[in-house]
Every structure is written in C-alpha cells, then in structure tokens.
Amino acid sequence: MNKYELIQDTFHMLQREISPDTGIRLNMPCEEAEEMASLLLEYGLPALRTTRLLSIYIAIKLALLRHSECDNALNGEKLTRSVLDGDYLYSFYVQLCLQWNEHDLLVRLAPVIKQIQIRRIEGASYDDALLRCWELFLEMEEGHVRKSCAI
C-alpha cells in the first residue's frame, strides 16, 4: 500500500466512524496527511492499525483546522459551527483511541494537544509538534526511545 491509498482508505474509514448526525465534512487536503502517512508506512505496522492510527491523526488535524477557522469567522453561525466541529473532533479522536485500545497513544497525545492549543492562543506555531509526538510514540513503541512527547 502506498501513502495515497492509505490516505484514501483512512478517509473512508473515518467517514464510516463519524456520526452522520454531526454534519461534519471531512474536507481536509490530502497533503495535510501525507507526511504522517509516510511516517506510519516506515514502521511496517499491520495495515489495519496503520489506517486506524492515521484516522486518529486526521481527526486531530481536522479539529485543529476547524478551530483555526474561528479566526476568520465573522458571523456567529460560522464561528459556532467551527467551534462545535472542532470540539466534536477532539472528543472523536479520544473515542477512536479508546475504541481501538490505543491507550498509550492517548496518554502521550493529550498533553501535547493541550500544549498546541495553548501555543496557538499565544500565536506560536505548532506545525511540527504533533508529528514529532507521533514519531516519538512510534519509536518508543518499537523500543528505540523512552522519551516524553513534551514540546
């Protein structure tokens, strides 16, 4: 499987997992997931787990993107929708981690995501922090590194 097939399979999986009642469209550019897809493929994980991990990553990225739309939302309805979608997607990634028994990942991601949110409020960049945390998690899981994901 190449990274583009992985991304496509992942979006299909996410579409099945997300409640249609939310009205949330999974309209993230594929480019946003390419680096993570490549990283996951490097580790030779089973295909299902690779797709699940990328699903969790995409849910987080979508939440970050939705909340970043709040900066440009001038009217109340669009602002409300961006906040609610982002909040739902943050809880959705937690749900996916629990559903797929990715407890160690959840423990590592939660503080980093909170740090990213704080940095964004302060106007700082977060681009590499999330991917770096994932990389450390995958290395730790493979037994290479025993580091914290703290940024």
Task: State the predicted function of each range.
Residues 3-4:
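Extended, compositionally biased accessory segments flanking or bridging domains
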Residues 7-151:
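Mg2+-dependent prenyl diphosphate-binding active-site environment of isoprenoid biosynthetic enzymes
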